[in-house]
């Protein structure tokens, strides 16, 4: 707070415990976020060392920082398989955590996520159309054909949800129910694509529907990282506007927030993150539900902390799910989407029960 800001306070307010208390809250939130970030990095290291055969930390250190001293086979395993896999889990979790946090804010609904409201299912159907029938946007390069299709369908689904919220005035429960209807609709359409697909194409579609990290690569990581950093930067620039929106549309507009434009830009960011996540690893549910709620409990509603907190917790949760997927059945790598669903369904039900009076 500057001297000019303090001069605007009521006489004697600057000397009251309000400002020290505010600084104490900020420090506490910073410590919590640092602890979450540290836990996320530890989980990343554990994820890299886990696999069909254990990898000692000394061997991991040599593969990462002293390749000339380490084993060539371990170097290939770490850099070409395990590290991309673990980093993809981290990055996808962070992207879905951010998308879920923004969607819950702009729709003012605790159950709103790209997965529960059909955005991820729409993206999966768009990708399925591109894979099975080759239907997509003309002129798009082959490398971007599937992600572009996923993005278009995710955006259309998100815009449809926003239109229903604003133009029909349905309650929060109505938006959730409509989103569930979208989930079933697009899942049925994906099932039709699976039915008409040939054997080779069907394998790819099964990979999408289960949500798996096994096809992670450095190229996909690079694309997702660049997009995620750009989206996170734009979201943090809108943090105070999103915080104001949590107070209600009319209050936010009185603060000078252009609510309609804010919602549209947020939907674009949500659609982009959801589409890329689905395009690269398939639908992974409930990360966008779990991470924002934990962040809200730990860090509050201030989006300067709530958004990055959701990002960090999303990365941590999916990284832990990745570890569980590798170790739950000996010799088998369970698709991580199955693990997140098993964890997410009870969490979803607990949220429904907690908010049953307003849903």
Q: What is each stretch, according to the model?
A:
Residues 2-359:
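Alpha-helical transmembrane segments in inner-membrane proteins
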